[in-house]
């Protein structure tokens, strides 16, 4: 039998696509980091017959079975009793679970009902996997020799807490994942995944650390991964590769791991003691939202104007009506005047603007959907950048790319200034 893990997510709502299966994504990432092999994922509806079939298949090919969902008090929550039935072991009530559920309900000003008692039932021999934030406990169980079963509730926040606090220490103590996989993700903007892969081609051939390109949310990324006994050992192998890639890719690499364009730009502005204001048209506040999502951004981001209507561009930003008549709102000239206007009105170091056609309508042969102008006004004057985004992924995609590109445009400007 393979020394591998398998993820089985239970819930008809997952099969119907009503809920995103974020639990499987989280667990897959966690298993990879722990160095635990993982080759299969299964989604099963709230049906005991089909769940038993999935368990039978999993038992033939995996040693660690991880279940999410089906631990609640309602009739369609069948994971625990189905597993007990499959392995032909009785359910046993745990008074400590019932007491914990009663206490949590009382804290919320509620009393438990009869169906809550089923959450206190676990198969004979199973240990409680505590749920600090919810009422549905999981279990750690060895129903057969060399087989480990872990169950978690389907609520992602509860499952993740239980995994971090109890499951990981348990698995490590049992000898799972003695060598973990450590990774660093380098993040790029303004370069396609294919172009990035070509530029760093020699690194993609490395056996250890491995370097793999992928794309996410419009940006290209490189994951540098290595199997190591500890983080210090891993960094000693990863960092030289990351440094070489940084040198090779220059300004296209904007950060790593949890960095975002907004957070990186914020650090630059804060270190320079400079401030920013924004004027937005087609992004409708999306640029400001990205900036204010960063804690402490009020130190450098002073505010913005959503000038969706031309009259707002004129009255609040000082855009010339003749310019609007002559070249239209989606133009380099208007983008520059918007940036100048918001910088002057809010008295900031930099003014950043966006005007464009996000679609799906409104495009013409000369100004198609996806045409966007970014304006940037600063101490030395004003400039603009023209973007032509593909519209095949729709309006929200164009708005997202526009806001990110504006952040990147100012980031590159600041780094060029030194």
Swiss-Prot record:
Write down what this protein is called: CinA-like protein
CDD domains per the UniProt record, alphabetical: cinA
Native species: Cyanothece sp. (strain PCC 7425 / ATCC 29141)
Sequence similarity: Belongs to the CinA family.
């Amino acid at each position: 039998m393979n020394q591998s893990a398998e993820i089985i997510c239970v819930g008809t709502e997952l099969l119907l696509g009503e809920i995103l299966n974020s639990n499987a994504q989280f667990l897959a990432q966690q298993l990879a980091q722990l160095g635990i092999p993982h080759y299969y994922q299964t989604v099963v509806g709230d049906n005991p017959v089909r769940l038993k079939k999935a368990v039978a298949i999993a038992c033939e090919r995996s040693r660690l079975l991880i279940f999410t969902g089906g631990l609640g008090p309602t009739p369609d929550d069948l994971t625990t009793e189905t597993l007990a039935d499959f392995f032909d072991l009785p359910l046993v009530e745990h008074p400590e679970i019932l007491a914990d559920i009663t206490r949590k309900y009382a804290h919320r000003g509620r009393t438990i009902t009869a169906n809550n008692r089923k959450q206190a039932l676990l198969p004979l021999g199973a240990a409680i996997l505590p749920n600090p934030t919810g009422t549905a406990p999981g279990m750690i169980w060895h129903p057969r020799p060399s087989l480990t079963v872990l169950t978690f509730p389907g609520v992602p926040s509860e499952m993740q807490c239980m995994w971090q606090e109890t499951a990981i220490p348990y698995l490590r103590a049992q000898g799972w994942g003695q060598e973990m996989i450590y990774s660093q993700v380098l993040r790029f903007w303004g370069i396609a995944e294919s172009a990035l892969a070509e530029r760093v081609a020699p690194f993609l051939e490395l056996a250890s650390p491995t370097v793999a390109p992928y794309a996410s949310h419009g940006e290209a990324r490189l994951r540098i991964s290595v199997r190591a006994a500890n983080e210090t050992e891993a960094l000693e192998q990863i960092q030289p590769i990351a440094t070489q890639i940084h040198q090779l890719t220059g300004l296209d690499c904007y950060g790593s791991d949890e960095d975002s364009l907004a957070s990186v730009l914020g650090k630059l502005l804060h270190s320079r003691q400079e401030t920013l204001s924004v004027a937005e048209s087609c992004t409708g506040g999306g640029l400001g939202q990205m900036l204010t999502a960063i804690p402490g951004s009020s130190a450098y981001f002073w505010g913005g104007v959503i000038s969706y209507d031309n009259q707002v561009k004129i009255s609040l930003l000082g855009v010339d009506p003749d310019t609007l008549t002559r070249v239209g709102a989606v133009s380099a000239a208007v983008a520059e005047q918007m940036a100048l206007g918001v910088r002057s009105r809010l008295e900031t170091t930099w003014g950043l603007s966006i005007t464009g056609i996000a679609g799906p309508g409104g495009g013409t042969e000369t100004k198609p959907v996806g045409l966007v102008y970014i304006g940037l006004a600063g101490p030395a004057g004003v400039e603009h950048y023209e973007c032509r985004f593909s519209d095949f992924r729709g309006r929200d995609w164009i708005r997202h790319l526009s806001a990110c590109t504006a952040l990147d445009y100012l980031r590159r400007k600041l780094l060029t200034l030194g």
